[in-house]
A protein has these predicted regions:
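Alpha-helical transmembrane segments of multi-pass membrane proteins predominantly involved
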Residues: 1-199
Length: 199
């Protein structure tokens, strides 16, 4: 249970996404409020990461989720980048009139997917984080429905991402066939020992 403290940033962002959706449903004209709450949520998640300094490398969920110095640094960089995007895009979304409750929520979902990818130590967890990030970015790429270029970008991104996801899954299946595992550490050990799962 103590180790679960290390994933409080991810848990908090997940709860923030659900809370912001509820606020958007029950409170009309709440786009600006949700936008500001999103920035506050990212700041709180950043504070949670700093509140739990990493002394050693830790693994969670049967070694499928890893917390270390590198993953912590990359999460901090991701959250800071998310805050920067929110601050710099505030005027743009108002000028183009695309400031809706979905915009900050999708951005939070994408950031959550990135954080899952960063700490993933398993092919399945990595793929889940990748899809969570990608699905949000599909919509964000085509968010300005009145702009044909935005719609075109969203469609192209979706098609290319669907193709790349299929190739990734195929590659993951080959790796699993060679190593008999989806865990990164076990995959490396099996490959280093020249044990490719061949009979």
């Amino acid at each position: 249970m103590t180790n679960l403290n290390l994933i409080f940033p991810e848990i908090f962002i997940s709860l923030a996404i659900m809370f912001l959706l509820i606020v958007g449903v029950f409170k009309k004209n709440s786009s600006n409020l949700i936008y500001n709450l999103t920035i506050i949520s990212l700041l709180i998640a950043l504070a949670l990461i700093f509140n739990y300094p990493i002394e050693t490398e830790l693994s969670l969920f049967n070694e499928s989720y890893k917390i270390d110095y590198l993953s912590t640094f990359m999460k901090i960089l991701t959250l800071v980048s998310g805050i920067f995007v929110m601050l710099t895009s505030s005027k743009y979304v108002q000028i183009t009139k695309i400031l809706k409750i979905e915009y900050p929520v999708l951005l939070l979902s994408s950031i959550l997917g990135m954080m899952v990818m960063i700490s993933s130590n398993d092919l399945i967890v990595f793929y889940m984080g990748l899809e969570l990030q990608s699905l949000a970015l599909y919509v964000l790429a085509s968010f300005n429905r009145e702009n044909l270029l935005s719609t075109e970008a969203g469609v192209k991104y979706f098609v290319l991402s669907a193709l790349s996801s299929g190739l990734l899954l195929y590659g993951c299946s080959l790796i699993y066939g060679f190593s008999n595992s989806t865990n990164f550490v076990l995959i490396a050990e099996n490959l280093n020992s020249n044990n490719y799962g061949l009979t």
